[in-house]
Amino acid sequence: MERIKELRDLMSQSRTREILTKTTVDHMAIIKKYTSGRQEKNPALRMKWMMAMKYPITADKRIMEMIPERNEQGQTLWSKTNDAGSDRVMVSPLAVTWWNRNGPTTSTVHYPKVYKTYFEKVERLKHGTFGPVHFRNQVKIRRRVDINPGHADLSAKEAQDVIMEVVFPNEVGARILTSESQLTITKEKKEELQDCKIAPLMVAYMLERELVRKTRFLPVAGGTSSVYIEVLHLTQGTCWEQMYTPGGEVRNDDVDQSLIIAARNIVRRATVSADPLASLLEMCHSTQIGGIRMVDILRQNPTEEQAVDICKAAMGLRISSSFSFGGFTFKRTNGSSVKKEEEVLTGNLQTLKIKVHEGYEEFTMVGRRATAILRKATRRLIQLIVSGRDEQSIAEAIIVAMVFSQEDCMIKAVRGDLNFVNRANQRLNPMHQLLRHFQKDAKVLFQNWGIEPIDNVMGMIGILPDMTPSAEMSLRGVRVSKMGVDEYSSTERVVQPHRSRAECSFLL
């Protein structure tokens, strides 16, 4: 308040006003700052003062034949004086209005074809249903998501060749259209865009949107397919969410879904064959999804799912180092371990053979309703920071992390026999046996885990064995965060192809 008063007093003195309005800016550093380089330093200001001028626009001289000097109200549309430094004409913003109202019209037949992605988006929104709005704490996780619905899955290079061939067919330069989808799209687009009057550069931009998958690393709670991402700003805030059902599907989401289903079926069938790797590769090569060979889709599609990763690894493609356990995606962000087989005794004196991971490791755990950061050593949970939608979701994440830690107190908490089977009536492996057991009832596990006093840390709270929050005590090593925990970012480590192939046969 004081500062404002002081400024008011200063401005009331005529000398101040004179200094501010009449003094020239002649400090070299300032002049340099605003005049070096082609980049506009203050676009908003520039636009403001340009529009305050009578003729802020320059146009080609031909405009003088196409637009009258004055409009119906007698306002001048262009000035006879040339623009300094070029032979262009100075034009008023009113000329734009005149042109929009009275200028030549052209055929609009190509607009829906070129701006196809926008027209389709409008249709999806028109037929979508919104509401109701719920107010609750939103746990958002940054995930890599697809942001332009309705695209084909070409690589940037493939799309570039198609665009050059469609938009600039007479330009020089080698263009090799090899894949089937490239040839089909090129033929289709050339026919669609015959005699198109829309600026070629605009057509090229719009084609890029249609052909290439664009992904961003965004905080999301809920649906991650592209038709949900396009309305992210309407469906979730910091403390609210709005229900939304999209008004239509798009090809890329269908392909992602079909790819996961196909990969799972292939992996399942390959597992029981005499040569799993060979049969998996053969099936990948002979399968088509939406008329495109599955191997071509696998090369371009970034979908991260266990079965899809196995197929990619078998083909020698790079895969990210993530795996699933108990409905959570685990990504190792630090550390390393070696596997050793050990025999352990449960609380029911049943012997289990488990593969123990020896070494210090850090993971991010990402599930549908909860996320966590886990730090562990050999058969010991060091720290678990978990965040979730509700008590139930947080409990699920804690159980999975406790089982994954392979701690002795977890194995000793088993009551009764472990004899869970899968759908094919085969016994589950020991780690999944333990998980199923505690997912049914985790009371003993939580009671036996132990509790510890906690420090007061901003945004963190403790959780007791009965899953109630506490500011004083918490399950040993476990804390609940009020903020979401991010999925590992795009800079994640990637498993090299030569290694992934070997891992793949082991996974099968």
Swiss-Prot record:
This is PB2-S1. May participate in the inhibition of type I interferon induction through inhibition of the host mitochondrial antiviral signaling protein MAVS. The knockout of PB2-S1 has no detectable effects on laboratory infected mice. Keywords: Host cytoplasm, Host mitochondrion. It comes from Influenza A virus (strain A/Goose/Guangdong/1/1996 H5N1 genotype Gs/Gd). It is found in: Host mitochondrion; Host cytoplasm, Host cytosol. InterPro entries: Flu_PB2_2nd, Flu_PB2_CAP-bd, Flu_PB2_middle, Flu_PB2_N, PB2_helical. Its main location: host cell. GO terms for cellular component: host cell cytosol; host cell mitochondrion.
